């Protein structure tokens, strides 16, 4: 995750702003600079290489002292920054909005995946600039539309029916912020269209999840899509979701947190996110993740719980 101010800076033109991507040498200069405390939140002028991000975001970049940040010296950083600028320059951002826009926390990996989709000649985003920009505006939280299959970050499709598409995420192969844990495995489920889904299509998805992904929890980050994650990583997801929710509220980015379909979401996660929306503390909310929940009655008649062992997936064991 990183703020949009880590990728670009605003330049006032007439009554709105044009956004310009940072170059890696300007960032490198900022990372070595001594800056007064009172100037930590201001864009840094490297003199030689142009404007750099505010020093308060130093931890967002990979350095000798911080290996968890972005690999900003890779070509992928520039591609992501340029893509963000293209999207922001396609809309009008006024002086009253610019600070709020640049403070938005976005998924770096999501944006890298959109770059990969853009570069794939077989992908619809390669052929449609309009759909590409729409996908980016959704990814950076500017659009109120949800991420559907056409505008999704992408990955490897492992399941699809008339209503849903399930993707295996390819973060292990990323350049900007790769997942380093080689045991990482995670999926995302997007709706093919933002409209009501028939019960039969929900039933098909639940059956697929129950038999092929029985070692995973279905959760949501509140953005209109589902994530299918290992139970061992649920607490980590909870920390991130809670932090992003609080940050967005603090900065005035009051995007609606979408709880999604309770029949699909893991019961404990639904309880966690509901509690978070009510304004409870992280500790209070997280307790619900480890609490034994009363088992819901089967919402679908005919969805059997009987299955032969050789038909049950061992993925995630």
Swiss-Prot record:
Cofactor section: Mg(2+)
Record EC number: 3.6.4.-
Job of this protein: Participates in replication and packaging of the viral genome. Plays a crucial role, together with NSP5, in the formation of virus factories (viroplasms), which are large inclusions in the host cytoplasm where replication intermediates are assembled and viral RNA replication takes place. Displays ssRNA binding, NTPase, RNA triphosphatase (RTPase) and ATP-independent helix-unwinding activities. The unwinding activity may prepare and organize plus-strand RNAs for packaging and replication by removing interfering secondary structures.
Keyword Nucleotide-binding part of the UniProt annotation: yes
Family from the record: Belongs to the rotavirus NSP2 family.
Gene Ontology BP, a term: viral genome replication
RNA-binding, as annotated region: 205-241
Alphabetical keyword list: ATP-binding, Host cytoplasm, Hydrolase, Magnesium, Metal-binding, Nucleotide-binding, RNA-binding
Keyword Iron: no
Positions that bind ATP: 107-109, 188, 221-223, 227
Location in or out of the cell: Host cytoplasm
A Gene Ontology cellular-component term: host cell cytoplasm
Primary location: host cell
Principal EC category: hydrolase
Molecular function in Gene Ontology: ATP binding; metal ion binding; nucleoside diphosphate kinase activity; ribonucleoside triphosphate phosphatase activity; RNA binding
Recorded superkingdom: Viruses
Quaternary structure and interacting proteins, as annotated: Homooctamer. Interacts with VP1; this interaction is weak. Interacts with NSP5; this interaction leads to up-regulation of NSP5 phosphorylation and formation of viral factories. Interacts with host DCP1A, DCP1B, DDX6, EDC4 and EIF2S1/eIF2-alpha; these interactions are probably part of the sequestration of some host SGs and PBs proteins in viral factories.
Residues annotated as catalytic: 225
Protein's recorded name: Non-structural protein 2
Database matches in HAMAP family: ROTA_NSP2
